[in-house]
Amino acid sequence: MAAPFDPFPAFEEYAHPERIVSASWLSARLGSPGLKVVESNEDSLLYDIGHLPGAVRIDWAKDLNDPLTRDFIDGEAFAELMNRKGIARDDTVVVYGDKSNWWAAFTLWVFELFGHSDVRLLNGGRDAWMAEERDTSYVVPEYPSANYPVVERVDENQRAFVAEVLGSLTQSGGMTLVDVRTPSEFSGLDEHGNPTSNTGVLRGGHIPGAINLDWSDAVLPNGNFRTRAELDKLYADLNPADDTVVYCQVGDRAAHTWFVLKYLLGFNNVRNYDGSWAEWGNMVRMPIETGENTKNNVSVS
C-alpha cells in the first residue's frame, strides 16, 4: 500500500511533488507498513556509522551491477535483492544517500528500470538528515522476504546507448545532449573525470554539441533541491518536448539531473546515457570536442 504524499508546501511547485519527501515527513512515518527506506551512498561504509532507523543498504556497485557484463542485474537478480531487503512490489521506497543524493538518484533510476511504481527521494539526503540531528541507528534490520516478483528490466525510454547517441550527431533535430560533469571535465582539462570513480579514460573532452550543466548546480549547499523558479532558470535553454539525453562519467551524476528534469521540471522525454564518458572517451575513432561551454552560462547562486 502506497504511503501518502508529502504535503510540504515548497514541493507543490514541482512537476511531480509525489516523488520527493522531506526529513520531517519521513521521520514521522519510519516503520509504517508499506514504507521501506533505502540508503545508497557513494561511500558505502557510511551506513555502518549510523543510518536512518530501519533503513536497508543497497550498494550501487555490488548490488545493482552485473558481476560480469558492464550492465545492470536482470529481473531475477533484482527480485532476489528486493527479497533480501524485505521490499515488496507495492511498497513505497524512499531512497537517500550522501553527496546530495548523487548515488541515491542513480539507485532510484535503476528501480524505475524495473518498473517499481513508487520510488521517492529524500530531499537533502543523508547530510540533511544528519544536520537536523534526527535519529540514527547502528542496527541492520532483517526483514522477511516479500515475495517480490521477477520483472524484467525495461531500458526503453530510460536509457540511451552509444550507437543512437553517435547517430544523432549527424541528424537534423536530433537529441539534446547535456553533459552534467564539472566544467574542467567538460573542457578536457580533467580527462579522468571524478577522481573517486576509479574510471580513467584515454581521452578528455565532451560529446560534440553537448551543453554543460553541472549536476550540482541544482542543489543548495545543504543538499536540498533549489526552488522551481531557480531550476527553470538553470535549465532555460532546454526544451521539455525535446529528446533530451544526460550523461556524465558513468551515469551516476546524470541520474541526479535526470530526476531533476523528469520529476521536478516535468520533462517527458529525458534519458540517461549511462555508458557516459567512461565509454565514449575510451572508444576508438569517436568524435570529441574540447574547450569551455559556450551554450549556457546561467548562474542561480
Swiss-Prot record:
Keywords: Repeat, Transferase
Record: active site: 248
EC supergroup of this enzyme: transferase
Gene3D superfamilies, alphabetized: Rhodanese-like domain (3.40.250.10)
PROSITE patterns reported for this sequence: RHODANESE_1, RHODANESE_2, RHODANESE_3
GO molecular function, one term: thiosulfate-cyanide sulfurtransferase activity
Catalytic reaction list: thiosulfate + hydrogen cyanide = thiocyanate + sulfite + 2 H(+)
Domain called Rhodanese: residue spans: 31-138, 171-289
The organism's place on the tree of life at top rank: Bacteria
One Pfam family named in its UniProt record: Rhodanese
Residues binding substrate, per UniProt: 253
InterPro entries, per the entry: Rhodanese-like_dom, Rhodanese-like_dom_sf, Thiosulfate_sulfurtransferase, Thiosulphate_STrfase_CS
Record-annotated membrane-spanning stretches: none
Assigned EC number: 2.8.1.1
Entry remark concerning the domains of this protein: Contains two rhodanese domains with different primary structures but with near identical secondary structure conformations suggesting a common evolutionary origin. Only the C-terminal rhodanese domain contains the catalytic cysteine residue.
The protein, known as: Thiosulfate sulfurtransferase
Lineage: Bacteria, Bacillati, Actinomycetota, Actinomycetes, Mycobacteriales
Gene: thtR
